[in-house]
């Protein structure tokens, strides 16, 4: 699990980061991959061989990237990861396709309740609970 503050402290360094894919946008000369872990997300810019290596990524797949951390004004949060080689890209676990689409009728969603958690508004309660538990454990360990 990564936090944005840990990544921001690594500007100018190469790091390995693992996370879930929130979005992949492939353009003519580069690809953008947004990774998330809990509440934190970061954008990776993949060029050259790395651009082709991210093609199999799908939303919610678990991946690892080795990248240089760069300060970038146009990136979300002012930080982005730059990946240049295919060897720096690893698909750890490809996300399974869901039996229904996020825009399905409410009846289908009720038949597949776990699919609701693909939508951010549905996961906020679980994210808040996870963060609260994490902070409580950290507090108790410090005592």
What do these predicted regions represent?
Residues 1-143:
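Class II aminoacyl-tRNA synthetase catalytic cores and aaRS-like
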């Amino acid at each position: 699990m990564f936090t944005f503050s840990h990544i921001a402290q690594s500007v100018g360094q190469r790091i390995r980061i693992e996370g879930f894919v929130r979005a992949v946008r492939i353009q003519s000369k580069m690809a953008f991959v947004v990774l998330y872990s809990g509440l934190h997300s970061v954008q990776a810019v993949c060029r050259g061989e790395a651009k082709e290596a991210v093609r199999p990524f799908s939303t919610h797949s678990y991946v690892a990237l080795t990248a240089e951390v760069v300060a970038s004004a146009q990136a979300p949060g002012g930080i982005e990861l730059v990946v240049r080689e295919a060897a720096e890209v690893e698909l750890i676990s490809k996300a399974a396709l869901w039996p229904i689409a996020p825009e399905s009728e409410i009846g289908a969603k009720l038949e597949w309740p776990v699919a609701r958690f693909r939508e951010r508004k549905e996961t906020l309660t679980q994210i808040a609970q996870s963060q609260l538990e994490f902070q409580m454990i950290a507090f108790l360990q410090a005592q």
